[in-house]
Curated annotation (Swiss-Prot):
Organism taxonomic ancestry: Bacteria, Pseudomonadati, Pseudomonadota, Gammaproteobacteria, Candidatus Palibaumannia
Family classification: Belongs to the NAD-dependent glycerol-3-phosphate dehydrogenase family.
Descriptive protein name: Glycerol-3-phosphate dehydrogenase [NAD(P)+]
EC numbers, comma separated: 1.1.1.94
Keywords: Cytoplasm, Lipid biosynthesis, Lipid metabolism, NAD, NADP, Nucleotide-binding, Oxidoreductase, Phospholipid biosynthesis, Phospholipid metabolism
Enzyme class: oxidoreductase
Length: 340
């Protein structure tokens, strides 16, 4: 059995995967959406809506749904992965036997491989081999606003310029979605992963009641940390001033649609880490990434004081006020340093 031939298969029927599928379909593309829970997918088929994550957003007629993964993967050579980073590798392993010979893989997952801190491009190459074109979508995007058709801008980077151009054509919409192509594959991935950590810090600052001034300072210092690590890992520093860097960082640090920010707010208000995670109810990418990024910082000999203090708070129960004083004391001592 074969699925309807489409321009894109979207793997992951959560809020963001569904929003991207809706956006692609609104652009006149045939799109197939697959989710791991067949009951959820069947409910969407009947309702023509993802009531669990995006209620009241009706699916375009060119958005199709499929419960069988092998059948779904016959629909297109273009496969968009939109799953949490902690299951990214297992999802690739699952889809590998069913991919078409001409398959191309793009992901909108933001994060690093859990426990190793590896970039998702390295995970993908290890599992799929080096012959499959790879791409990443990142940038300041909340699923609800994207699904509602509100103006949004994203960045795309790919290992193949043809793939990048094809993705831009599929996604770009003059009315609502601006798509920027970037050749910095490493930087676009890092920006999407590291901003979650800084967003937790911004949330803690706001939970403590430190105000807008402190939040702005933390975002600025956080961007400097991201840029330093990115440069050490081979990224282009200017990438972090674009959509995949500053754009995503500002969005995630300042709006309560961000679960990483909400998680930080709870901790700043005195809620224990594990309780805060349960209250959020969804994967908090920045929590696991904090430990992994600190390992990367050590490996590349990059100073990341905000990440270090967040690690102490999240994994060693350091008092949040003491962590803030540590940062303030450091910046006073380093006041002659011109580079943030």
């Amino acid at each position: 059995m074969s699925a309807v031939i489409t321009s894109m298969i979207v793997i992951g029927a959560g809020s963001y995967g569904t929003a991207l599928a809706i956006t692609l379909a609104r652009n006149g593309n045939k799109v197939l959406l697959w989710g791991h829970d067949p009951v959820h997918v069947q409910a969407m088929k009947v309702a023509r809506c993802n009531h669990a994550f995006l209620p009241n957003v009706i699916f375009p007629s060119t958005l199709y749904l499929e419960t069988s993964l092998p059948v779904a993967l016959t629909a297109s050579r273009n496969v968009l992965i939109v799953v949490p980073s902690n299951v990214f590798g297992s999802v690739l392993t699952r889809i590998k036997p069913h991919l078409r010979p001409d398959a191309r893989i793009v992901w909108a997952t933001k994060g690093l491989e859990m426990n190793t801190g590896r970039l998702l491009q390295d995970v993908a190459r290890d599992i799929l081999g080096g012959h499959i074109p790879l791409a990443v979508i990142s940038g300041p995007t909340f699923a609800r606003e994207l699904a509602a058709g509100l103006p949004t801008a994203i960045a795309i980077a790919a290992t193949d310029v043809t793939f990048s151009a094809d993705l831009q054509q599929l996604l770009h919409c003059s009315k609502s979605l601006l798509v920027e192509c970037n050749i910095d594959f490493i930087g676009v991935q890092l920006g999407g992963a590291l901003k979650n950590i800084i967003a937790i810090g911004a949330g803690i600052s706001d939970g403590l009641g430190f105000g807008a001034n402190a939040r702005a300072a933390l975002i600025t210092r956080g961007l400097a940390e991201i840029s330093r690590l990115g440069k050490a890992m081979g990224a282009t520093p200017s990438t972090f001033m674009g959509m995949a860097g500053l754009g995503d960082l500002v969005l995630t640090c300042t709006d309560n649609q961000s679960r990483n920010r909400r998680f930080g707010i709870l901790i700043g208000q005195g809620i224990e880490v594990q309780t805060a995670q349960k209250n959020i109810g969804l994967v908090v990418e920045g929590y696991t990434n904090t430990k992994d990024v600190l390992k990367l910082a050590s490996r590349y000999r990059v100073v990341m004081p905000i990440t270090e203090q967040l690690y102490q708070i999240l994994y060693h129960n350091k008092n949040v006020y003491d962590a803030a004083l540590t940062l303030l004391g450091r910046y006073y001592k380093d006041k002659q340093i011109s580079y943030l």
